[in-house]
A protein has these predicted regions:
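Bacterial N-terminal signal peptides
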Residues: 7-14
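Boundary of Sec targeting at the N-terminus
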Residues: 19-20
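Hydrophobic/aromatic-rich core segments of domains that either
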Residues: 219-251, 352, 357-359, 406-484
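Positively charged n-region of N-terminal signal peptides that target proteins for export
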Residues: 1-4
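Extended, non-transmembrane interaction/recognition domains
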Residues: 207-208, 212-353
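Long, contiguous, compositionally biased segments that the model treats as domain-scale units
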Residues: 27-30, 34-212
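Active-site neighborhood of thiol-dependent amide/isopeptide-bond enzymes
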Residues: 195-208, 379-439
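Secondary-structure boundary elements
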Residues: 135, 139-143, 148-189, 333-398, ...
Length: 484
């Protein structure tokens, strides 16, 4: 019996020792992995700072690419006698795909925070499109001693010493909480940095650049005489802004700069260029506009009252118009694929949904079409804005005028949201319309695309029914733009 107890005791002792050994090994592995992560990022920042000390080369900016402008086609009122019994297929030879959006950039390693006592962490409170935000910053923030490459490298090293980890972490948290797209995130970083330094000086620009870089974004820094600039790389070709082409990427200055600047061409690990997709609207503090009532002329029950968020409209006003894959038609898909805010959806969709309830799909689309055709006042962009400008759906509900682009974008958004029907944009030189894929074959002009029949719906052909093409549209030059 005593021998049995002895054996059991030995086994238990071995098990305890084995468990302790395993736990110690696991902890050692964790510490080693953490050290590897930290050394990887630390070394990346060390290499970057060292590269910054080298000579910054002069580069000449490429001239801005103007936004393409066609001679606009004025709206045309529909006459009943124009309705034809025969269907006409619109032959589309070119289809513009919508490139799949990529996930937002991430830091090269997870940002891990150690608890910080209050004296170490201060709060930077700032207004971002009238939305109150705050992030932790060190009590004593860094200041550059000069405006040269050595000072900038020294400043980069100081920012990378660990004191700004909480700042970076909080900024990334705000990106998630406010649903900020890449463009919105960059603007937020700049607003925070200038607030922290109470100035748009070189200190603020370096902090903004460091945070943007550490968040995973592709950027370069430039010196314009003694003024530091952030250059952001974009997957999109941005209109009306000069740029610097470096290693096949276009870089744009966050703030205006001269055409000849010195650039540090150092690249950071796993950097990713900005995307200008707005897959989710920024969740900003709501600042309601005045109530606007919109009503269909033919279907008086299609009537809504809406208040848009001025803060969101103000953000959209900063959005740079751009194209993808050297195709200017891709710009409209970026606007059309942006969702309406939840607040606006809750204001207009219940009323519209109630009015189309019980109707056939064609009748429902026809009422939505007439609503967009007649509830908005048409005006040329040149007259209102001095040049072409497309609206996000939210903007069309805010501004008093809307042209063919704005109407088609809004119509496509409403039909996809309320009826869950596929919609494409149809481009004619000087004009933009839409086509809807109905569950049944409907009468009217149509296009065949990906095995589906899309029936023409033109929100600027005033009073026209589903299936009617505006007169004088050259179908041989029409192109289809796919939407999500």
């Amino acid at each position: 019996m005593r021998q049995l107890f002895l054996c059991i005791s030995l086994l238990l002792s071995c098990s305890v020792l084995s468990a302790q050994s395993f736990e110690e090994q696991f902890r050692a592995f964790q510490q080693s992995a953490r050290a590897d992560y930290e050394s990887f990022r630390d070394k990346a920042n060390e290499r970057y700072a060292e590269f910054m000390r080298q000579a910054w080369e002069y580069y000449q900016a490429a001239p801005a690419v103007p936004e393409p402008e066609d001679d606009p086609v004025p709206p045309v009122p529909y006459e009943d006698e124009e309705q034809k019994d025969d269907d006409k297929e619109v032959i589309i030879e070119e289809v513009i795909p919508t490139p799949a959006p990529e996930p937002q950039p991430e830091p090269i390693e997870p940002i891990k925070l150690e608890p910080q006592p209050e004296p170490v962490a201060n709060k930077c409170k700032f207004q971002y499109f009238n939305t109150q935000c705050e992030v932790r910053i060190p009590v004593e923030i860094n200041h550059l001693r000069a405006a040269n490459s050595d000072a900038f490298a020294e400043g980069w090293e100081n920012l990378s010493d660990g004191d700004y980890e909480a700042t970076l972490y909080d900024c990334l948290q705000l990106r998630e909480e406010l649903k900020l797209c890449d463009w919105a995130y960059l603007l937020m970083l700049y607003e925070m940095s200038t607030t922290a330094y109470q100035s748009a000086n070189n200190d603020a620009m370096l902090l903004c650049a460091w945070l943007y870089c550490q968040s995973g974004y592709q950027m370069r820094m430039a010196l314009d005489v003694d003024k530091l600039h952030l250059l952001y790389a974009s997957r999109h070709a941005i209109y009306n802004r000069s740029y610097f082409n470096l290693d096949g990427y276009n870089y744009y200055t966050l703030l205006p700069a001269s055409n000849s600047v010195q650039i540090c061409t150092a690249a950071f690990e796993n950097e990713q260029a900005m995307s200008l997709y707005v897959l989710e609207y920024p969740h900003l503090q709501v600042n309601k506009s005045q109530v606007r009532t919109l009503q269909s002329e033919r279907y008086s029950q299609m009537r809504v009252s809406v208040q848009t968020n001025r803060n969101l409209v103000e953000f959209y006003d900063t959005y740079p118009s751009s194209e993808l894959n050297n195709n200017p038609l891709t710009r409209w898909a970026m606007y059309a694929n942006t969702p309406l805010s939840r607040e606006v959806q809750q204001m207009i969709y219940p009323a519209l949904r109630q009015q189309i309830q019980g109707l056939s799909t064609r009748e429902a689309v026809e009422q939505i079409l007439n609503f967009v055709q007649t509830a908005f006042v048409y005006e040329y962009d040149d007259k209102v804005w001095g040049g072409d400008r497309a609206f996000f759906p939210e903007e069309t509900l805010f501004y008093p005028y809307a042209d063919c682009e704005d109407r088609s974008i809004l119509f496509s958004r409403i039909v996809r949201d309320l009826l869950n029907l596929p919609v494409v944009l149809i481009y004619y030189p000087g004009h933009l319309a839409t086509a809807v894929a109905f569950p049944e074959i409907e009468q009217g002009d149509y296009i065949s695309l990906n095995g589906k029949r899309f029936t023409i719906c033109d929100p600027t052909y005033i009073g026209a029914p589903v299936g009617a093409t505006m007169p004088n549209m050259n179908n041989q030059t029409a192109q289809a733009i796919l939407l999500q």
